[in-house]
Amino acid sequence: MIALLIGAGLALLFALVGTPLFIRLLVRKSYGQFIRDDGPTSHHTKRGTPTMGGTVVVFAVLLSYALTHLIMWMMNPRSPGPSASALLLLFLMVGMGLVGFLDDFIKISKQRSLGLDAKAKLVLQGAVGIIFAILALNFPNADGVTPASTQISLVRDIPWLNLAFGGTVLGAILFVLWSNLIVTAATNGVNLTDGLDGLAAGASVMVFGAYTLMGIWQSNQACGSPRQTGGGCYSVRDPLDLALLAAILSAALVGFLWWNTSPAKIFMGDTGSLAIGGAVAGFAILSRTELLLAFIGGLFVLITLSVIIQVGYFKITKGKRFFKMAPLQHHFELKGWAEVTVVVRFWILGGLFVAAGLGIFYAEWVVLL
């Protein structure tokens, strides 16, 4: 718990102090956001607002995680160092962040609201996701537990949903596909949510807060742990280090949100939304709660579904729209809701989804008692 408090405190400090410094740098270089012409007219006033703020979040997370382990080692040289699971998650976060950074850089350099084309972005996301998935099935600990499993999970691995039903090779291939589906869905879900001041950052704070609580619980109730109190146990590698990383991410986003809330002084850009989405997917996979992500990240799912419905309805009806505008948050803006109202109500909705996910997580354990 001491490590979690140290890590979260450092991340909050780095994000709070680092974001305004980064804003000044971006203003000097005239790195501002370009706004869609077909978006809500109220958004045109945001043109030129510094973007790529996710860079601060990523660096705050990396620095806080490294310093926390250094401090813990100085306090106790026998304390465990960085874990394979956390390093894999950081790889996924940074990799997706780099894809987003490239997208943001193209927007700024070419002075347009569109960066990488959809195919190029998916290819780059897929490449990062494939490397992550392959590595996640390796690096077993002393008990032979790898960071990820070929078994599909809700609260823990579901025995009868094993992707390796046809052998190890087929299982690995199917896992890579399954993992990439989760990664692509999560990254694009957060990316679509990042359309209003503070919306994606605030929603993500709650999501990572949930993974912090889940990681602590999985550590206490790990199979073979002397602290296990009965019921089901968890075969998750490095749950406490994942909880540390989730706490750091949540705190870093709180620090960033101070400057990103309406009226935003900086946007996270695709650099931030893709990095955060990658981290969300990483936690779902490495904590072995993939299916639970549909609840924990329910707001991201809902907003993604609104885009799918809009596009599908438009094609079927040959030009008609189901929503006034997609993603869903812009539909309510065009209905006359103030931006802050939309953001706060969507935060509430996101919080309810997170609460439902945590309820399922703990209810499953209680039932097994």
Swiss-Prot record:
The family database entries (InterPro entries) matched by this protein are listed as: Glycosyl_transferase_4, PNAcMuramoyl-5peptid_Trfase, PNAcMuramoyl-5peptid_Trfase_CS
Cofactor(s), by name: Mg(2+)
Q: Which reaction does it catalyse?
A: UDP-N-acetyl-alpha-D-muramoyl-L-alanyl-gamma-D-glutamyl-meso-2,6-diaminopimeloyl-D-alanyl-D-alanine + di-trans,octa-cis-undecaprenyl phosphate = di-trans,octa-cis-undecaprenyl diphospho-N-acetyl-alpha-D-muramoyl-L-alanyl-D-glutamyl-meso-2,6-diaminopimeloyl-D-alanyl-D-alanine + UMP
Natural source organism = Arthrobacter sp. (strain FB24)
Enzyme class at the top of the EC tree: transferase
Pathway the protein contributes to = Cell wall biogenesis; peptidoglycan biosynthesis
Q: Can you quote a single GO CC term?
A: plasma membrane
Family the entry assigns: Belongs to the glycosyltransferase 4 family. MraY subfamily.
What kind of membrane protein is this, topologically? Multi-pass membrane protein
PANTHER family, per the entry: PHOSPHO-N-ACETYLMURAMOYL-PENTAPEPTIDE-TRANSFERASE, PHOSPHO-N-ACETYLMURAMOYL-PENTAPEPTIDE-TRANSFERASE HOMOLOG
UniProt entry tagged with the keyword Nucleotide-binding? no
- Gene Ontology molecular functions: metal ion binding; phospho-N-acetylmuramoyl-pentapeptide-transferase activity; UDP-N-acetylmuramoyl-L-alanyl-D-glutamyl-meso-2,6-diaminopimelyl-D-alanyl-D-alanine:undecaprenyl-phosphate transferase activity
Q: Which gene encodes it?
A: mraY
Source species, domain of life: Bacteria
Where in or outside the cell is it found? Cell membrane
List the protein's name: Phospho-N-acetylmuramoyl-pentapeptide-transferase
**Main localization of the protein described in the UniProt heading:** membrane
- What role does it play? Catalyzes the initial step of the lipid cycle reactions in the biosynthesis of the cell wall peptidoglycan: transfers peptidoglycan precursor phospho-MurNAc-pentapeptide from UDP-MurNAc-pentapeptide onto the lipid carrier undecaprenyl phosphate, yielding undecaprenyl-pyrophosphoryl-MurNAc-pentapeptide, known as lipid I.
Source species taxonomy: Bacteria, Bacillati, Actinomycetota, Actinomycetes, Micrococcales
Which GO biological process categories is it annotated with? cell division; cell wall organization; peptidoglycan biosynthetic process; regulation of cell shape
Its Enzyme Commission number(s) read: 2.7.8.13
